[in-house]
């Protein structure tokens, strides 16, 4: 599926990630320690889970959660036929190397595609009923102005949501993935 040009571009990106890591490794060390502490404090306050999509940010948060004590369960809400098939490949690669408590709760395809229902809210409601009303998310302020406002208003954790990488940059995320050889 990937062209030679795609793979060459990916190699160049990985080289930039390694260079960023070389130059900013101490910054990433602090970000990592801080993120694990935020997860631990949030998990200590009551039942929670890591909401995982198997995208790059979710993979980082799942890995950070695996370092936390207590380590909350990781839950994926696959969206049936509309789900990116590569998510399952990333999931399988991650689970083959990391012993975590993991569950899947199938989201109804209708919920994700009918235009009248908010798939994310339906997934959170299902998780609240099945696991816990509180969750750990991989959202980052850099991704949108709405997420930035959420971070400014609530910080890395509110009563129901934890955002341990909320202030990380995309470069931080890719450097973390490179440092820990995490799948994406």
Predicted regions and their residues:
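Nucleotide-activated chemistry modules centered on ATP-dependent adenylation/adenylyltransferase
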Residues: 1-184
